Amino acid sequence: MNRMSTIFLKIALVLIGIPILALCIFLVPKVANYSAELFPNIAYIKYLVFIYLYVTAIPFYFALYQAFKLLSYIDKNKAFSGLSVRALKNIKYCAVTISIFYAAGMPVFYLMAEIDDAPGIIVIGLVIIFASMVIAVFAAVLQKLLKEAIDIKSENDLTV
């Protein structure tokens, strides 16, 4: 792969991470305060929302880091290695983790949507769940294909 294309993809990864970081810094506190206003009788809801949203950001950034490592392996001509397979496996697990976290949090989204009469909150949660699952399936397919390609390559290297 051309080095410029991997540099472009690395820049794209950074540009994907920056808005999520901005959301974590600026929007998460507002959402937590808003949830505390919606549920004044549940004192700990603000901190629960804080923890929930920040914990879901951890696998996202870990997956971005793994994608960055994968692009580095491609730059070093180590694309067909066990390291690449492991990076794809980690990306798959991160995507599944994000889906599980948001699926577990959907009841809170539902309650917020019911109180505020905003069904868009539920749609946002569902979009995040399904997008993460699509990424997980795509990473799993790529992982399997890469593993098979590595096996074929090693067989060809042994037959020479």
Swiss-Prot record:
Membrane topology of this protein: Multi-pass membrane protein
Gene Ontology CC: plasma membrane
Keyword hit for Nucleotide-binding: no
Pfam families: DUF2975
Localization: Cell membrane
Main localisation: membrane
Keywords for this protein: Cell membrane, Membrane, Transmembrane, Transmembrane helix
TM region positions: 7-27, 48-68, 95-115, 121-141
Tree of life domain: Bacteria
InterPro entries: DUF2975
The protein's name in its UniProt record: Uncharacterized membrane protein YoaS
Origin species: Bacillus subtilis (strain 168)
Organism taxonomic ancestry: Bacteria, Bacillati, Bacillota, Bacilli, Bacillales
